[in-house]
UniProtKB/Swiss-Prot annotation:
It is a multi-pass membrane protein. It comes from the Eukaryota. It comes from Rousettus amplexicaudatus. The cytochrome bc1 complex contains 11 subunits: 3 respiratory subunits (MT-CYB, CYC1 and UQCRFS1), 2 core proteins (UQCRC1 and UQCRC2) and 6 low-molecular weight proteins (UQCRH/QCR6, UQCRB/QCR7, UQCRQ/QCR8, UQCR10/QCR9, UQCR11/QCR10 and a cleavage product of UQCRFS1). This cytochrome bc1 complex then forms a dimer. Belongs to the cytochrome b family. A ubiquinone binds at H201. This is Cytochrome b. The chain crosses the membrane at residues 33-53, 77-98, 113-133, 178-198, 226-246, 288-308, 320-340, 347-367. Heme b b566 binds at H97, H196. SUPFAM superfamilies: a domain/subunit of cytochrome bc1 complex (Ubiquinol-cytochrome c reductase) (SSF81648), Transmembrane di-heme cytochromes (SSF81342). Heme b b562 binds at H83, H182.
Amino acid sequence: MTNIRKTHPLFKIINDSLVDLPTPSSISSWWNFGSLLGICLGIQILTGLFLAMHYTSDTATAFQSVTHICRDVNYGWVLRYLHANGASMFFICLFLHVGRGLYYGSYIFTETWNVGILLLFAVMATAFMGYVLPWGQMSFWGATVITNLLSAIPYIGTNLVEWIWGGFSVDKATLTRFFAFHFLLPFIIAALVIVHLLFLHETGSNNPTGIPSDMDMIPFHPYHTIKDALGMLAMILVLLMLVLFSPDLLGDPDNYIPANPLNTPPHIKPEWYFLFAYAILRSIPNKLGGVLALVLSILILALMPLLHTSKQRSMMFRPLSQCLFWLLVADLLTLTWIGGQPVEHPFIIIGQLASILYFSLILILMPLISIMENYLLKW
């Protein structure tokens, strides 16, 4: 008798995706982050659901309701900090997942890559709206500054901003709609994840060499499930250490001050995972130019398949490209540091140089060095 998992219409889909899926035998731990992102999404949806049961999206009571969750709800503080730090873990895994894709040439699977970029934008939008909900000082001013960027769009900008705000400033209507969208978006993300996997399973996974491995496949279960389980254990350990020992390590102290439209914080800055993009935004003196650079800093990923000039897919055997890749990583870390610094000398010039280097590396230097490597290898 055939196993039910191979015949039942529903189980068959799960089986073909998680059990009998042919997977390259050579994929390293860098391929763990897809499953870790799935776990992160699950944690965020669950903790978010329970938090939503106690949260009120009203400017008068939002801050108080978060305080109530932390003080009066059974293990409410665990839920709140799991959700806040879970977002940080989500972005760490996201950045590593995208970095893996860049290093090993996974962007050659264009459909999977483009759905991934959509997912990145959706997660960033969700995280931004979630940061507004506790209605602290940084929540309010962050929402004001970031939504105000849309006013740089010619002709329709001002009307667009007021339409998003639901009034003439960030107020009750803004908070209510941000809560509604923050609740809805994770389910859209879950649907996009299924599409992402659908496209991935059409082509099969890439591997560190970048060479097709159709002749060397192993079943996903048990080989990669046990490997993923180790990654999950490590990630959950780090998350629990953050939650239980230093839950506010990655947060901003200003967000413990209730939102006050009459008092601007000395340094308005987003959560750490947006600082690199914020630094690029601030490095351009022109408002519209800054907004375009901000969007392009992520959208540039969509150009990766077009900018691939090497005859090899992966960077595994391309030492010169590897040097530029790690320079890009160092540059992004520099931008993250600059994004959290005040707008004064020498941080302004460092931010501008790091922004120029970021775009130069991706658009000019990496494609050129790939052509040079082809020439050196007489290809």
